[in-house]
Amino acid sequence: MFHATTIVAVKKGDQVAMAGDGQVTMGQATVMKHKARKVRRLFHGKVLAGFAGSVADAFTLFEKFENKLEEYQGNLQRAAVELAKDWRMDKALRNLEALLIVADKQSMLLISGSGEVIEPDDGIAAIGSGGNYALAAARALVKNTDLQPAQLVQEAMEVASSICVYTNDQIIVEEL
């Protein structure tokens, strides 16, 4: 379900960075696009969001999440919980296949369609087919280097792209 995507985010203090690869795969064997933008700025540039899953579903969720951010004046946690409620309860939304990582300078959350809103304990989150590789790399880098979040996510994505066939090295990094 979550092939052709890796998203990783790191929060250190009031700095946060998120990175995603650019590969879009159709089916199991055909790369359709190399430079897709899977990480975006939302809510006047104050929130980062990245998705893994169906592109059409992700656009729907980005739009709904941004509406929730507007409704709750940029309160990331409240917007995330309300999106997760809608996602779980609404018949049309329930069928969407995607995961989101959202972050602002205060917090980072992983949002799933089954209603989970999870804040990572260590300020590091990753999703998608290369997510476990990126997560392991980011944790090792945070523990053993003094790199800033933007450098950390870049390096973690490079590790993931060297291992996961559904993740390419066309990496987009956003930071707050």
UniProtKB/Swiss-Prot annotation:
> Active site annotated at which positions?
T5
Is the keyword Cytoplasm assigned to this protein? yes
The subcellular location is: Cytoplasm
Mind telling me which Pfam families this protein's record contains? Proteasome
* Quaternary context: A double ring-shaped homohexamer of HslV is capped on each side by a ring-shaped HslU homohexamer. The assembly of the HslU/HslV complex is dependent on binding of ATP.
* Activity regulation, short description: Allosterically activated by HslU binding.
Write out the residues that bind Na(+): S161, C164, T167
Protein name per its UniProtKB record: ATP-dependent protease subunit HslV
The family annotation for this protein states: Belongs to the peptidase T1B family. HslV subfamily.
Main site of residence? cytoplasm
- The EC category is hydrolase
EC number of the protein:
3.4.25.2
Q: What is the lineage of its organism?
A: Bacteria, Bacillati, Bacillota, Clostridia, Eubacteriales
Identify the domain of life: Bacteria
What are the entry keywords? Allosteric enzyme, Cytoplasm, Hydrolase, Metal-binding, Protease, Sodium, Threonine protease
Annotated GO biological processes are: proteolysis involved in protein catabolic process
Q: Which reaction does it catalyse?
A: ATP-dependent cleavage of peptide bonds with broad specificity
Which GO molecular function annotations are given, in alphabetical order? metal ion binding; threonine-type endopeptidase activity
Q: Name one GO cellular component term.
A: proteasome core complex
